[in-house]
């Protein structure tokens, strides 16, 4: 506990020093009490020093104390008509505009104006910053009007602040009006507008302004904005490449933007060419290349680069794990996670866990799922976002709907994503009635379901044979929530009708769909035709499927099985022969089983068993 020695003179410097060493709000309150008791708090030099030293402190309890001192000993004691330098006011406005409640900056500006305190360009620029953070365009426009009434309108710095505010609030037209009316512009004016156009996808407008920009004003920010904008589109990568070549100087952002553009559009060799010759690389460079190789399926190339990295951070580990998960190397992803903890001593972030949990889910390792959940609880990760969704999904796919429900019930502020994950889990476990009840709960709580909610409920109804509930859900989606059905919704409805034996209704729905049915819907319908002995319809569907997706083995297998169910062995042999001639092979089934802490992998028609930790 921090205390003053009774014999110590409470000088201003020592007070500031002791305040700076405070670890908690209780420490600050104790010192505040002592300052009041000794009367030193009335010293304006001390209060000024406190405000200037701590108003923008990263320690909330110190920043709050500084603001409190300012309001109590400066604002409340201020006399109207008294001339006061706005410097101290600006320090507190800055504290609010960059802090957790930017609205206080606006209130403080109003207080300055009411009390006749001189307002300068720094006061206004800080309040414009607060308006930007709040998306409060109306407040920005009021300040814009105030500038015109005072003599500050011609200040280039404030004009640039207004452009930035309008762009941040999505008012591209207002920012361009502001830009066009400026009698004088600098590189900040041009760069702000160019960046605004790029972020809105208006690369042509950005290029027009870039070409109008005086050459002496163009700097790295200007060039990098244009390269980044062009690199986002497939037809703009080559233009970005030409701009990159024409740049008078390049920095790391220039190289990374160009590499990112190549990677995004699958041009990994071009990206590698730049990667090999660039003078300096950072973690972003390496992570971008790893991600690019992984997305193209070149996981081993990605791992080679990962192993070559001189320094790895969480982003690099996340990229490698995500690459493994995308390519279904789930065990390898878990090994990378283990290496991250044991070798690098890096702490995983939310993104790390959102990548790792689906890997565990795909392996179905309940023991590993429980261990990971305990780890998340121990490290006090927040489950209100994507992590909670991934945790529910993991338990559902690992076979424990009870654990999934416990996680779901323990999340206080549930978003629709949490409800969707729980409904999806209930669907996996064939608990259609519970899933439908959850939809009714969502309705009662006045939450807004989305298209994924209805995919989950329809899927659950399909697995549980709930025809009436499925039809009700479909109508609720369309009529009440005005959600246009997508292929997934139609697929679920075809499955619901087909499973119930309503082949004709399912056929009519397929024919009336406003979108072209995909092969999944046709295969669902074909399976139902086979099951319900609708031979003629099924044969037509199968032949259509083979024409539409001629190299998908499941279509041939379904047709063969249907012929077999009718004892048409000659036709079965004909389909099998067709598969051989076209070199179409069934994808072998694979299963995992966890035994004594090891996962064993089994493949159909294989006597070998692979195992891993």
From Swiss-Prot:
InterPro entries: E_motif, Pentatricopeptide_rpt, PPR_At4g14850-like_plant, TPR-like_helical_dom_sf. One of its GO terms (cellular component) is vacuole. PPR repeats lie at residues 85-119, 120-154, 155-185, 186-216, 219-250, 251-285, 286-312, 313-347, 349-383, 384-414, 415-449, 450-480, 486-516. PROSITE patterns: PPR. It is found in: Plastid, Chloroplast. Residues 521-596 are annotated as: Type E motif. The keyword Magnesium does not apply. GO terms for biological process: chloroplast RNA modification; mRNA modification; mRNA processing. GO terms for molecular function: RNA binding. Keywords: Chloroplast, mRNA processing, Plastid, Repeat, RNA-binding, Transit peptide. Disulfide bonds: none annotated. Unlike other RNA editing factors, CCR4 does not contain identifiable E(+) and DYW motifs but does contain PPR repeats. Therefore its association with DYW1, which lacks PPR repeats, but does contain E(+) and DYW motifs, is required for its function in RNA editing. Plays a major role in chloroplast RNA editing. Acts as a site-recognition transacting factor to recruit C-deaminase. Involved in single RNA editing events. Required for the edition of the site 1 of ndhD (ndhD-1 site corresponding to cytidine-2), which is a plastid-encoded subunit of the NADH-plastoquinone oxidoreductase. The interaction with DYW1 is required for its function in editing the ndhD-1 site. PANTHER family: PENTATRICOPEPTIDE REPEAT-CONTAINING PROTEIN (PTHR47926), PENTATRICOPEPTIDE REPEAT-CONTAINING PROTEIN ELI1, CHLOROPLASTIC (PTHR47926:SF456). Interacts with DYW1. Belongs to the PPR family. PCMP-E subfamily. This is Pentatricopeptide repeat-containing protein At2g45350, chloroplastic. It comes from Arabidopsis thaliana.
